[in-house]
Amino acid sequence: MAIYEAGEMYLLTIYLLYQKGMKKVRAIDVCREINRSKPSVSIALSQLKEEDYISVTNGKIDLKEKGIDVAKRVLSRREAVSKMFEKIGVDKEISKKDACKIEHVISDEACEAIQKFIGE
């Protein structure tokens, strides 16, 4: 089953929280990070768990291999689009905000072309 945009965002959020040095990411941490309600996050996490993107043990959320792959792919897209926007003269903060919106819909082919364009 293909991952949906919101699912990508949850996986990326979990991934980034661990990258920031959190030892134990819980649902409440995800709620705070993306400003969503506990019920919304719980539903999304249940779906991600059912689809084998994450595991949850004693409240601790762990990304499984395919969850990590999705998070890294989305982050790579975000960084490529943001860098491209900056390269063509868009303000850094606007570049980040716009890239966050585009990262879920851009094709692999377009992302690869952007990465070549920016020299990565």
Where are these regions (language model features)?
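Key DNA-contact positions within bacterial/archaeal DNA-binding proteins
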Residues: 39, 93
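A short, conserved structural fragment
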Residues: 49-59
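Basic, amphipathic "hinge/linker" alpha-helix immediately C-terminal to the N-terminal HTH DNA-binding motif
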Residues: 59-77
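N-terminal helix-turn-helix DNA-binding core of bacterial DNA-binding proteins
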Residues: 2-36
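C-terminal regulatory/oligomerization modules of transcriptional regulators
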Residues: 97-120
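Basic amphipathic alpha-helical segments that dock to polyanions
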Residues: 10, 30, 41-49
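Residues within the alpha-helical elements of helix-turn-helix
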Residues: 33, 70, 87
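N-terminal positioning helix adjacent to the helix-turn-helix/winged-helix DNA-binding module
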Residues: 6-10, 77, 110
